[in-house]
Curated annotation (Swiss-Prot):
Lipid bilayer topology: Multi-pass membrane protein
Organism: Saccharomyces cerevisiae (strain ATCC 204508 / S288c) (Baker's yeast)
Keywords: Membrane, Signal, Transmembrane, Transmembrane helix
Main location: membrane
Membrane-spanning segments: 33-53, 111-131
Name of the protein in its database record: Putative uncharacterized protein YDR053W
Additional facts recorded: Partially overlaps DBF4.
Any coiled-coil regions, as ranges: none
Keyword Thylakoid: no
Region forming the signal peptide: 1-19
GO CC annotation, single: membrane
Subcellular location: Membrane
Recorded superkingdom: Eukaryota
């Protein structure tokens, strides 16, 4: 079930467009040191993933290209499927945590909520969620 939800999200990000006609782009996550991987970072990452899975449609836009993150040997698809299959998020194996840091450890810049639209700015990436 979780794998199916993520595949739907991946198709949204890479191949679809939302009801407002905005083409969905890919995301870019900047690698950060292991020491910054904290419980609040995990909570924020999981919250953003929860938004992806519960919204009607989503859009991610970044000023940098990230094609390799989706199709490389350490692709987003494979890593996130691994993460979503683990029950206890605070006891992830070290290797999985190391691989996930560039993908899930965010520095939240600002959040804007307007009716059914939530906009989150994370570094150079902007996330749009329509409910």
């Amino acid at each position: 079930m979780r794998e199916s939800l993520f595949i739907i999200f991946f198709q949204f990000v890479c191949h679809s467009s939302n009801s407002l006609g905005v083409t969905l782009g890919s995301t870019f996550f900047r690698p950060v040191p292991l020491l910054t991987w904290t419980a609040p970072s995990i909570d924020l990452a999981l919250s953003i993933l929860a938004l992806f899975f519960s919204c009607k449609c989503c859009c991610c836009w970044s000023s940098r290209r990230s094609r390799d993150l989706f199709f490389g040997k350490d692709s987003v698809v494979l890593l996130l499927l691994q993460l979503l299959s683990l029950e206890n998020t605070f006891k992830w194996p070290a290797a999985v945590v190391d691989a996930a840091i560039p993908l899930l450890c965010f520095k939240l810049v600002s959040v804007s909520f307007n009716g059914d639209l939530i906009i989150i700015f994370v570094g150079e990436t902007i996330f749009f969620f329509l409910f």
